[in-house]
């Protein structure tokens, strides 16, 4: 698809995901034992034929930029293909991006240089699989100014999203960002139609909208709050329903905003379901990433004769379980689990050592942590709260490189 430029917004602070985002951008947070969050959006682009991609970075972007370099330097510039990381250029003044629309406005020169007819705007911090090609086809067929991908959710959940109203032709006639009382679907009072933060603009429409928005001192320079509501009046904004039968990706209807510790934890745990709600195993839709070349995971008997055990868990390469027990957990690469240690309902990031006799329950252990022998985490909320962050649902988070 040579006529479309893809812009991935990857510069948000992700403060609700702290401490996992204390030293990295949210799209660079590890997920599922081997991936980074942004890998899902980039994989969708790859399989959808989108080969001109700008990744707009900002907040603590080193880890993200390194991942893009190591894992995604796969396109051929001689064929006009690229994935380019774009930090703030300060071309329109020495300030950080003030909103999603402002981020693209400050890089309009790159859009103009691309000579594309259409611009796809994506977020780098959602977990889902989607073929974007049919959405572009509908955008062109409708002669739309803007096409917004959408899905229906429970009305209570809709408060966190932009809520849309559409007619029988899927033309959008209303859009309100994060309403306290979300309007429901006409045929279902318990469900609302929400934006997924996936947009296709016709280039000239986007350019004009961003220029006008930049001149509006009252604007928050956000797509959901400012750009989309104004474009609706043109009558050329259409909705594209996610989870249809179009495209090459299997219909699993899974999309998650992993902006909080609890939503991030649950999205990981979803992968451990007997039939996961998101299919990572579709042969022609593999999730690409960068992964160090570690040897295969293994179990080994400990000195006391205990066998290493994995039950209903995802285990990455380089893991050695020497007499420990791992149940319903995700263990990333190069992790060492020692004798009589137990890990239950937990997420372990790379390069962690879990000492003899440790008990870890309902926790997330970030990278480069050495958990001392017989440490308990997730069993005593009062003790855990003195050392670590605990989410609303009781998930204990041990930050990167924490020293016990």
Curated annotation (Swiss-Prot):
**SUPFAM superfamilies hit by this protein:** Nucleotide-diphospho-sugar transferases (SSF53448), Trimeric LpxA-like enzymes (SSF51161)
**GO terms for biological process, alphabetical:** glycogen biosynthetic process
PROSITE patterns for the chain: ADP_GLC_PYROPHOSPH_1, ADP_GLC_PYROPHOSPH_2, ADP_GLC_PYROPHOSPH_3
Which EC number(s) are documented for this chain?
2.7.7.27
GO MF entry, a single one: glucose-1-phosphate adenylyltransferase activity
What reactions does this protein catalyze?
alpha-D-glucose 1-phosphate + ATP + H(+) = ADP-alpha-D-glucose + diphosphate
CDD domains per record = ADP_Glucose_PP (cd02508), LbH_G1P_AT_C (cd04651)
Q: Where does alpha-D-glucose 1-phosphate bind?
A: 97, 162, 177-178, 195
- Residues in coiled coil: none
InterPro entries cross-referenced by the UniProt entry: ADP-Glc_PPase (IPR011831), ADP_Glu_pyroP_CS (IPR005836), GlgC_bac (IPR023049), GlmU/GlgC-like_hexapep (IPR056818), NTP_transferase_dom (IPR005835), Nucleotide-diphossugar_trans (IPR029044), Trimer_LpxA-like_sf (IPR011004)
Keywords attached to this entry: ATP-binding, Carbohydrate metabolism, Glycogen biosynthesis, Glycogen metabolism, Nucleotide-binding, Nucleotidyltransferase, Transferase
Q: Which Gene3D superfamilies match?
A: Hexapeptide repeat proteins, Spore Coat Polysaccharide Biosynthesis Protein SpsA, Chain A
Q: Return the broad EC class.
A: transferase
- Pfam families recorded: Hexapep_GlmU, NTP_transferase
Q: Part of which pathway?
A: Glycan biosynthesis; glycogen biosynthesis
Q: Which family does it belong to?
A: Belongs to the bacterial/plant glucose-1-phosphate adenylyltransferase family.
Q: How does it assemble?
A: Homotetramer.
Q: Which NCBIfam families match?
A: glgC (TIGR02091), PRK00725.1 (NF001947), PRK00844.1 (NF002023)
Give the protein's function: Involved in the biosynthesis of ADP-glucose, a building block required for the elongation reactions to produce glycogen. Catalyzes the reaction between ATP and alpha-D-glucose 1-phosphate (G1P) to produce pyrophosphate and ADP-Glc.
State the name under which the record lists this protein: Glucose-1-phosphate adenylyltransferase 2
């Amino acid at each position: 698809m040579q006529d479309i430029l893809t812009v991935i917004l990857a510069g948000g602070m992700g403060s609700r995901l702290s401490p996992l985002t204390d030293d990295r951008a949210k799209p660079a947070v590890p997920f599922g034992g081997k991936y980074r969050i942004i890998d899902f959006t980039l994989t969708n682009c790859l399989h959808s034929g989108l080969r001109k991609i700008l990744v707009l970075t900002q907040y603590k972007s080193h880890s993200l930029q390194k991942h893009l370099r190591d894992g995604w330097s796969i396109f051929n510039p001689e064929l006009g293909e690229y994935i380019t990381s774009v930090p703030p250029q300060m071309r329109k003044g020495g300030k950080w991006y003030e909103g999603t629309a402002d981020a693209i406005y400050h890089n309009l020169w790159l859009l103009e240089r691309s000579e594309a007819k259409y611009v796809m705007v994506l977020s780098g911090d959602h977990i889902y699989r989607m073929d974007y090609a049919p959405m572009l086809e509908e955008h062109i067929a409708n002669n739309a100014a803007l096409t917004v991908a959408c899905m229906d959710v429970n009305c209570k959940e809709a408060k966190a999203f932009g809520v849309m109203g559409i007619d029988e032709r899927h033309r959008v006639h209303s859009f309100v960002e994060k309403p306290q009382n979300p309007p429901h679907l006409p045929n279902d009072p318990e469900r609302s139609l929400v934006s997924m933060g996936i947009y296709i603009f016709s280039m000239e429409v986007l350019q004009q909208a961003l220029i006008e928005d930049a001149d509006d001192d009252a604007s928050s320079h956000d797509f959901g709050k400012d750009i989309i509501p104004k474009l609706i009046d043109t009558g050329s904004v259409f909705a594209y329903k996610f989870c249809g039968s179009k495209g090459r990706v299997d219909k699993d209807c899974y999309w998650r905003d992993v902006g909080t510790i609890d939503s991030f934890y649950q999205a990981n745990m979803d992968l451990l379901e007997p039939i996961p709600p998101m299919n990572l195993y579709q042969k022609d839709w593999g999730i690409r990433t960068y992964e160090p070349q570690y040897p295969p995971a293994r179990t080994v008997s400990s000195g006391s004769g205990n066998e290493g055990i994995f039950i209903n868990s995802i285990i990455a390469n380089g893991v050695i379980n020497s007499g420990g027990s791992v149940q319903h957990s995700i263990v990333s690469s190069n992790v060492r689990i020692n004798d009589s240690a137990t890990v239950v309902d937990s997420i372990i990031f790379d390069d962690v050592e879990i000492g003899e006799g440790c008990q870890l329950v309902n926790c997330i252990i970030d990278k480069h942590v050495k958990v001392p022998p017989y440490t308990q985490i997730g069993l005593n909320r009062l003790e855990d709260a003195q050392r670590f962050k605990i989410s609303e649902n009781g998930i204990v988070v041990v930050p990167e490189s924490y020293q016990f």
